[in-house]
Amino acid sequence: MEDFVRQCFNPMIVELAEKAMKEYGEDLKIETNKFAAICTHLEVCFMYSDFHFINEQGESIVVELDDPNALLKHRFEIIEGRDRTMAWTVVNSICNTTGAEKPKFLPDLYDYKENRFIEIGVTRREVHIYYLEKANKIKSENTHIHIFSFTGEEMATKADYTLDEESRARIKTRLFTIRQEMANRGLWDSFRQSERGEETIEEKFEITGTMRRLADQSLPPNFSCLENFRAYVDGFEPNGCIEGKLSQMSKEVNAKIEPFLKTTPRPIKLPDGPPCFQRSKFLLMDALKLSIEDPSHEGEGIPLYDAIKCMRTFFGWKEPYIVKPHEKGINSNYLLSWKQVLAELQDIENEEKIPRTKNMKKTSQLKWALGENMAPEKVDFDNCRDISDLKQYDSDEPELRSLSSWIQNEFNKACELTDSIWIELDEIGEDVAPIEYIASMRRNYFTAEVSHCRATEYIMKGVYINTALLNASCAAMDDFQLIPMISKCRTKEGRRKTNLYGFIIKGRSHLRNDTDVVNFVSMEFSLTDPRLEPHKWEKYCVLEIGDMLLRSAIGQMSRPMFLYVRTNGTSKIKMKWGMEMRRCLLQSLQQIESMIEAESSVKEKDMTKEFFENKSETWPIGESPNGVEEGSIGKVCRTLLAKSVFNSLYASPQLEGFSAESRKLLLVVQALRDNLEPGTFDLGGLYEAIEECLINDPWVLLNASWFNSFLTHALR
C-alpha cells in the first residue's frame, strides 16, 4: 500500500501526510491504510479549492491554470495540511477579520464567498452514515459539511453542494480512479474495511471492538497485546535505551552513564593570555562617518563622486603622523599609503571630468601593504614527486588570548538605536490571504523596532563593502582599485544621507576558487584614541590625520581625528555571504515569530498586536553575571538582530565548533531544569570539545562567558 500511495499521489501531498502522521505519533509503515486515507483527503481538499477565485465584483469564477487572471483572490483558504499551530493561527485570523464563529475542531477549508468553514469528508462507507457521524462530532451549524464517497455519491449540508457540477465531477472521477487502481493491486478490500468511525476522545475512553483489534495490530514488533505494551512503557527506564545500545558495542567501549545533577557541570574554562584583538573586516562602534544630506551633486550615486563630495565636507585635515604603530609592520608604508590616497584624490579633482573608478599607482608602499610578490612560488606537484623530504611547511599554533571588555561594549553598542533609518523594506503588494496579512503586520512591527538599530547599519555597511569589493575583484583583477566605504540612510525627518567611512584599496584578485584570497588595505576614519585600548588595535597602524570640531552642550570642542589602517584579506565565499547579510534580519524576525506563535497558541488567537504594543511587559534578553536581563520587545528584537549580525561579522571555525558543542551541554542543562533526570557519559570529553574552540576569537570568548553566566543562574 505504501508503494501505491507514493506512486499515486503528488509528492507534496505524500510529504504533508507523512508530517500529519508524525505529528499524531502514527507509523505510516504500520498504518498504511491510514496513510492512503490522509493522502486522499488532502487531494480532495486541494481539488475542491483549485481554479476557484473571486473577481473584483465579489463573484465566484472558475479560472484554469496559466490564465493571466490567476492573481485574483482565491475563493477558498486551505486549512487542512498545515501544522496545528499554523492552522489555528489561520482560523483565529479568519474569525477575527470576518466575525465568523470559532469552530471547536479544525475545519478543512474556509469559503470567502459564502463566509463559512467547510469540513470535507471522504468515506468508503455509506455517505449518510458518515455525514451523521461528522455532524454529531462537530455539533455546529456554522461549519458546512460536504461528504464524497468512492462510489460517486455525495452529501452536503442542506443539499448545498457549494461547487459547480463540473468541479465536483472531477473529484468523483479521481476517487473512482483511486478505487480502481487499489482494486487492481488487491488493496481495496483491506482499505475499505479499515475505515474507523468519527469518535472524539471526550465521548469515549474505553477501547473495544474494532478499535481494540486495530490497537493490537498497530503495536511494535514482539508485543502480543496492548496490555503487554502498556506494562513495558510504564516500567521504561529513561536512560535504559542508551545502556542497551552500549552493551551491544565492542568490549573496549566502556561508558558508564552518570546522573547529571545541579552540582555536576563546571564553568567552561576560558583561556589565559594577552587580551583578544579586533578582527572584523571594518570598524564597528569606533567608525566615524563624513556625511552629506540630500545629495544632489553631479554623478550622485557613483561611489567615487559621493566619496569626494563627503571628503569636501571636512576642513580639519592636517599633516598625518603615526600615533599607534603596528608592531610587526613597516608603519611608514601605511603612512605613505594614506598620503598617496589624498594626493590621487586631489589629482582627480583637478581633472575636468571625474572618472567612475580610480586605480591607484602601484607604488612600493602599496605593493608591500597588499602583499604583492610575497606569496611563495607555486610548483606543480608532479615536479616534486622525487623530493624525499617534501612536506607541508610548519605553521605555529595560534597564541591563546583572553576575553577583553571591548567586545561586550561592541555588542552593547550594536543593540543601541541611532538617529538614522537604515532599512526600507519594499512593499510586496496587497495582502490576499489572512496568513499574508499576519506576516506583513509582524514584518512591519519588527522593521519599526530595528530600522534605527546600529546592527542594521552594520548590515548595510557590510553588504555595500562586500558587494563593491567582489565587483572590483572580478572587474579589475590586476589593478589596485580604490573603493570608497559608503552607506546610505535617511534622517529622522526623512532626508537622504550618504556616508563615507573611509577607503579600501584592493590588491591583485585572480580568484579562481571560492577560498582564494584577495588582499586589501582598509583606511577608516575614527574619533577613538587607540592608546586607550592598544590591545584592541593590535592589527592596526593608527594615524592622526586631522582635528574635528564637535558641537556639545557646553559649546564647540575640537577632537583629534584618527585613521585606522590595516592589511586584511577575504575570499569569494566570504564576500558572497557578506553580500547576503540582510539574511540576519530574516533570522531574527523568525526567532521573534516563534515567540509570538507560542503566545498565540496559548491564547488561541493571534497575539502579534498585543506582543508589540504592550509596552509594560518585559521579556528575557540574555544572561549576565547579575542574572537574567530583561527588556522591552524592541530591545529583544535588537538584541537578537545584533547576535545574528555578530555571528556573520565574526564568522569562524572557532564559532562553528563552539556553537555545535556547547549546544549539547545546553540541552542537557535544559533537560535538568525540566526535571527530566538526564544522564551523560564522557562529560569531560564534551568539555574538551567545547574548550578546544576557545583560542583567540573575541566573539567566541564572549559567548563562552555568557554561557558560564547561564550555567550559574540556571543551576541555582
Swiss-Prot record:
**Where does the chain bind Mn(2+) 1?**
41, 108, 119-120
Give the Pfam families listed for this entry.
Answer: Flu_PA
Q: List the disulfide bonds.
A: none
Q: How is it modified after translation?
A: Phosphorylated on serines and threonines by host kinases, including human casein kinase II.
A Gene Ontology annotation in the biological process aspect, one of them, is:
cap snatching
In short, the EC number is 3.1.-.-
The note on cofactor binding and number reads: Binds 2 manganese ions per subunit.
- Nuclear localization signal 2 (NLS2), short sequence motif: residues: 184-247
UniProt keyword terms in alphabetical order: Cap snatching, Endonuclease, Eukaryotic host gene expression shutoff by virus, Eukaryotic host transcription shutoff by virus, Host cytoplasm, Host gene expression shutoff by virus, Host nucleus, Host-virus interaction, Hydrolase, Inhibition of host RNA polymerase II by virus, Manganese, Metal-binding, Nuclease, Phosphoprotein
What GO terms fall under cellular component here? host cell cytoplasm; host cell nucleus
UniProt motif Nuclear localization signal 1 (NLS1): location: 124-139
Q: Any idea which positions bind Mn(2+) 2?
A: 80, 108
Q: Which cofactor does it need?
A: Mn(2+)
GO MF terms on file?
endonuclease activity; metal ion binding; RNA binding
What job does this protein perform?
Plays an essential role in viral RNA transcription and replication by forming the heterotrimeric polymerase complex together with PB1 and PB2 subunits. The complex transcribes viral mRNAs by using a unique mechanism called cap-snatching. It consists in the hijacking and cleavage of host capped pre-mRNAs. These short capped RNAs are then used as primers for viral mRNAs. The PB2 subunit is responsible for the binding of the 5' cap of cellular pre-mRNAs which are subsequently cleaved after 10-13 nucleotides by the PA subunit that carries the endonuclease activity.
Q: Which family does it belong to?
A: Belongs to the influenza viruses PA family.
Q: How the protein assembles, per its UniProt entry?
A: Influenza RNA polymerase is composed of three subunits: PB1, PB2 and PA. Interacts (via C-terminus) with PB1 (via N-terminus).
Name it.
Polymerase acidic protein
Organism (species)? Influenza A virus (strain A/Memphis/4/1980 H3N2)
The gene coding this protein: PA
